[in-house]
Amino acid sequence: MAIFKGAGVAIVTPMKENLEVNYDKLDEMLEEQIAGGTDAIVICGTTGESATMTEEEHAATTRFAIERVNHRIPVIAGTGSNCTRTAIQLSKEAQEDGADGILLVTPYYNKATQNGLIAHYTAICNEVNIPAILYNVPSRTGCGLQPQTVATLVKDVENIVGIKEASGNISTVAQILHLCDGNVDLYSGNDDQVVPLLALGGIGVISVLSNVAPAYVHDMCYKFFSGDIAGSRKMQLDALPLVDALFCEVNPIPVKAALNMMGKEVGTLRAPLTEMEDAHKEVLKKAMMDLGIL
């Protein structure tokens, strides 16, 4: 059974002025996401600035989200690392704290071989028994999962149940689904490719857009599931200007700017990420207004 179906939010990590995690604000955001119809919370992912969090912060933020959500919807913990031992430790802590699943990004910077990726993921998943979702985003990690590697992992590692596919390559997605033969739950990792991936057999999205429009992304998925393909497609196309604006600078710079424009007060970003350029903010603001978010 899938961990979730529909729209999972890759939620931002709100920060105080001193750049500590703002748990009060995170609590508010979790409640708003649940009220907006989000189908799952993905905590401490790329959008959550996991790369600049300490292991202690990572574990504490994950634990907080699990406790506050309290089984109302699934919580998936981003526990990937470019260090296999670190990923194992984070994954074990997430399991102990009650996570419904883990999201495992490919090891960044190291540029592991495909055999290295198999060894990495196998080692992590042998240490836990909760479901694991692979995360393929080579544009950020410099390391991509090939379709045959995904198929091997899905076949040989029992608790690898899904993949967040953010390569942007529809052919890669099709090959993964073909080789896995119905044995993998595929989630779009790109907000501009949700409907195309659903059409190929995906079951949802792990979304940045959901931070600012949870009901919209949920509805786009469930229109598709209910057979209203035209309605879902229209929502996908209508959202493209905002999606483009949310990625005109590296994620999560624009989405934090968008949330602050909405009065959510999620704070700034940890270095080396910097505030969004003013010219880009104007483009983002217009796109949000055009979609009715502002």
Language model segments and positions:
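C-terminal alpha-helical cap/extension of soluble enzyme domains
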Residues: 6-14, 36-38, 199, 206-294
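A general structural signal for well-ordered alpha-helical segments in protein cores
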Residues: 26, 58, 62, 87, ...
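Catalytic cores of TIM-barrel enzymes
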Residues: 2-3, 175-178, 259
